[in-house]
């Protein structure tokens, strides 16, 4: 499964390549580093499993929000807005191979 966080403020999409990704501002403790003072050292964890993306807040000071609501844990759906202390991303989920599932048109003979 392809899971990406698309920065709402612009910038390149962040592809989540690990099954479990620790998100925060400290590079020694986190797989995905967000360099912002309001993001906790270890802010949240993102888990890819069975074609879904799950979130668990790690007791962050300023909280984790999904679609404006503060959450402790839950599933993220395509198009959800994930906010870590005001830093916002749109969640994109899709197949590993974007061509998978596409059917080529039959060529006339």
Where are the predicted features?
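Regulatory inter-domain linker segments that are low-complexity and enriched
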Residues: 1-4, 87-109
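Catalytic-core "active-site belt" of small-molecule-metabolizing enzymes
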Residues: 11
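Forkhead-associated
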Residues: 3-6, 15-86
């Amino acid at each position: 499964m392809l899971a990406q966080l698309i920065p709402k403020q612009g910038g390149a999409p962040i592809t989540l390549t690990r099954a479990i990704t620790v998100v925060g501002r400290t590079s020694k403790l986190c797989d995905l580093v967000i360099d912002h003072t309001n993001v906790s050292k270890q802010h949240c964890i993102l888990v890819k499993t069975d074609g879904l993306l799950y979130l668990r807040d790690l007791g962050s000071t300023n909280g984790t929000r999904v679609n404006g609501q503060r959450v402790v844990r839950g599933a993220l759906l395509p198009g959800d807005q994930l906010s870590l202390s005001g830093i916002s991303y749109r969640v994109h989920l899709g197949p590993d191979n974007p061509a998978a599932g596409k059917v080529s048109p039959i060529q006339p003979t």
